[in-house]
Structures are given as structure tokens and as C-alpha cells.
């Protein structure tokens, strides 16, 4: 972990988000064979088992921090980790539309900016919009091959994906909030633990089995290890020293990579406008570490995150 301290937090978050970009295709592969709730429950079982040694110290730390931090942990786990992932997975595997659920994730920064202002006293400076607006335009270009003739299919897909985006954005802000008192590995462990409880409750409600078939279980294992444990470790390690406003912007690499991966997976080709969109996104994210002080007004010094032990 010490080697990661030399890497700007926003870049670690961008790398984690890019790893999440492979996630939708894997979930889409299980369409018709495994329910969304079963998939997400399986992920959380694996993740809790892998982080079990961290659980008791994490629980002690969060209860010592106070009820607000306990509430934040529950919302991150049950809301962002469990419910949001179930909704997003269902939007992918329960419908024929692959692109729309991914496209809608670009609303996350808007939610995160508002929540960060309310909860963390982070204020975007004028410089933020000089990076955010080109990134937003880039997403529009990447996600719409015909940018002046856009399309969106299915209100159910839109509703599920939008709810997931809001919950994930709130999870980003609350994760930053928790990092004021807890180390990143404790936030990670609590996310999985409360997420597993929520998934276990969702199984009987949705009438979903706890286990699928052997083939899909191997895919769930990949999701848990790569886009789950590894990506989220990088994410929370970077988030402890990155304002939530900047984090939400760097997370936009996720839908960009997901759309591009989906296009190639389904034997499609990028138009020149889509490549322009990719360039705008990469440019905005790359400039973040160098423009940080001009982009966001951060919280007072006494509210900065707890130092990592690694």
C-alpha cells in the first residue's frame, strides 16, 4: 500500500472505475440464467468471507465513532452496495438494452456535488465546471453514436439505473465522510457486511435462490474479486485523500469504459464523435490532480480523513 501513496487519489479512483467498466458485460452474460439478487448476494458472501478478519475491528471503530457513522455505514452497505447493484444488474439482465443503464450513470457527479456541499462542506469552484462540462459532453458523445438524434429505451431501465446512480453517488459522499474517522479498510469491510445483510433480506422478498449454477458462480467470483475487492480497495484508498466532488468526476471513467467495452463485445464500432468523447473524458480526468485546488474548496483541516495505517 505504501507505493500507492505516491499516486494521486483521483487517479486511483479513475483506475478503480475503469475496472468497474468490465462489470456490466459480465453481468449481462448471466442474463436469463441467474437473477440480479442472486448475483449480488453471491458477490457479498465472497467479499465478506475475504474481509472477515477486518470485520470486528471495523465494527468496534464505527460504533466508537458514533451513531452518524453507523448510519452512514448502513446506507453505504445496504443502499450503495446492495440495493443499487441489484437495481443496476436487473436493468442490465432483465432488459435487452445494454447502453442506457450505463449512460445514466453520468448523473452521479450532479448528485455527489449537491450531497458533498450539504454533508462535507465541499464547494466546487468555477474551475470544476471547466472540467466537468467537457467530461459531460464527452459522455454524451461516447454514449450516443448520433449525438443530435439521441435515443433511450424503456422507462423501467431508466428508473432502475437512475436510482442506482443516486445511491452510488450518495455512497461516494458518505464514504468520504466515514474516512474522517475510519481507516479505508474498515469502510470497505463494513460496506460488504451491511450489504450482505441487505441482500439476505432481499432474497426471500424477490423470491430468488441463494445459489445459481457452477458457470455463473465462476463469473460471480470474478465480479467479487476483480471489480469488487481489488477495485474497491483502490477506490477507498484513493477516496480517503480525495474530495467527493473530485471523486465523482474521476468515476466517470466507469461508464466510458463500460460503453466502449460493450460496443466491442457486441461487434460494433465507434464513430469519430465517440472517439472525441473518449478524448474529452480522459483529458478532464487527467487534469484533475494538477487542478485540484482550483476545482474544489475542501473542508477545514480538522475534518480531513483519518490517516491510513498502511
List each language-model region with its residue ranges:
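Hydrophobic transmembrane alpha-helices of multi-pass small-molecule transport proteins
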Residues: 51, 115, 127-146, 197-199, ...
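Hydrophobic/aromatic residues within transmembrane alpha-helices
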Residues: 30, 39, 43, 91-92, ...
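Transmembrane alpha-helices of multi-pass small-molecule transport proteins
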Residues: 32-83, 109-116, 166-171, 188-207, ...
Amino acid at each position: 500500500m505504501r507505493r500507492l501513496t505516491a499516486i494521486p487519489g483521483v487517479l486511483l479512483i479513475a483506475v478503480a472505475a475503469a475496472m468497474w467498466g468490465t462489470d456490466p458485460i459480465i453481468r449481462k452474460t448471466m442474463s436469463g440464467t441467474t437473477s440480479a439478487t442472486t448475483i449480488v448476494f453471491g458477490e457479498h458472501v465472497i467479499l465478506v468471507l475475504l474481509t472477515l478478519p477486518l470485520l470486528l475491528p471495523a465494527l468496534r471503530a464505527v460504533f466508537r465513532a458514533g451513531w452518524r457513522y453507523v448510519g452512514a455505514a448502513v446506507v453505504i452497505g445496504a443502499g450503495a452496495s446492495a440495493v443499487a447493484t441489484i437495481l443496476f444488474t436487473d436493468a442490465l439482465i432483465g432488459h435487452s438494452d445494454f447502453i442506457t443503464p450505463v449512460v445514466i450513470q453520468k448523473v452521479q457527479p450532479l448528485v455527489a456535488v449537491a450531497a458533498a456541499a450539504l454533508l462535507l462542506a465541499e464547494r466546487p469552484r468555477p474551475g470544476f465546471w471547466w472540467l466537468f462540462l467537457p467530461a459531460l459532453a464527452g459522455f454524451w458523445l461516447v454514449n450516443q453514436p448520433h449525438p443530435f438524434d439521441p435515443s433511450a429505451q424503456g422507462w423501467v431501465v431508466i428508473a432502475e439505473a437512475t436510482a442506482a446512480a443516486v445511491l452510488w453517488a450518495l455512497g461516494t459522499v458518505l464514504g468520504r465522510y466515514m474516512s474522517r474517522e475510519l481507516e479505508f479498510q474498515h469502510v470497505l469491510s463494513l460496506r460488504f457486511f451491511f450489504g450482505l445483510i441487505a441482500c439476505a433480506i432481499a432474497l426471500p422478498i424477490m423470491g430468488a435462490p441463494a445459489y445459481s449454477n457452477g458457470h455463473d458462480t465462476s463469473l460471480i467470483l470474478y465480479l467479487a474479486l476483480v471489480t469488487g475487492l481489488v477495485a474497491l480497495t483502490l477506490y477507498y484508498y484513493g477516496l480517503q485523500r480525495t474530495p467527493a466532488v473530485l471523486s465523482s468526476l474521476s468515476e466517470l471513467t466507469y461508464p466510458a469504459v463500460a460503453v466502449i467495452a460493450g460496443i466491442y463485445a457486441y461487434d460494433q464500432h465507434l464513430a469519430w464523435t465517440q472517439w472525441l468523447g473518449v478524448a474529452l473524458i480522459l483529458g478532464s480526468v487527467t487534469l484533475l490532480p494538477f487542478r485540484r485546488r482550483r476545482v474544489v474548496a475542501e473542508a477545514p483541516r480538522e475534518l480531513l480523513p483519518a490517516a491510513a495505517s498502511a
